[in-house]
Amino acid sequence: MIHFGFSYMGLIFLLMLFIPNIIWTKHKPKDYEQYVVNENKVLLLFERIGEILICGIVLIFSDFNLRKPNLWTIWLILAVLLMLCYEGYWIRYFRSEQKMTDFYSAFLGIPVAGASLPVAAFFFLGIYGANFFLLLATVILGIGHIGIHMSHKKEVFNDEKKKGILSRIFRVVFIAALVIVFGGITIIIGARNYNAIRGCIHSSNGIEEEGYIDLCGQEQYYLIRGEDASNPVIIWIHGGPASPD
């Protein structure tokens, strides 16, 4: 669920995000400043709000830290892999001629990798921690950060040929599928976070307990919640070590 506490994984992710960006301030593309003045102010506001929220949220919730491996750990693995790809993107940029085309190019087939990779990584970290606050903050950041990068990319590659109709249809369908899948995950996590918070607020004598028990030789995840600790209700139990938390 949601647990307050220091997140060392959050700190690691922030360091992986900030260190190359700090180095980049000394290696900006020579024409970068002329593009900055054209940035959409609304997108810039979303970007700044998202950055502030993420920097705080990933450090104050311990749900992002390592815990007993289970199927849900795949989200953390994916998040780490995306951040490693992000570092790879920066290594390629620093070894290039450091032009605007290098800065806004794709990496491993991922468009505007400098923006999309960290946004996706923090979103997956939010799923791993089952933390709606980080998911929401990442969406806000993504709207601004990826939006700004996409607009700059169009300016930089202004001579790029338009893609065919089939390519554009596939792109729309693919994006729509991603929105539906990850939007659904976000809603489910948000609903569970809301129920947990509401239970803590409305019941000082309540109970909120989760863990793993051995049943018939198989480790199973359980969740117990109730407004009265003397009369709790088991609301989640299933076979295998996997947990949506």
Listing of model-derived features with the role each one plays in the protein:
Residues 234-235:
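Hydrophobic beta-strand anchors of alpha/beta hydrolase catalytic cores
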Residues 231, 240-245:
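Short substrate-entry loop that stabilizes the transition state in hydrolases
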Residues 214-225:
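A short loop-to-beta-strand scaffold at the N-terminal edge of the catalytic core in hydrolase folds
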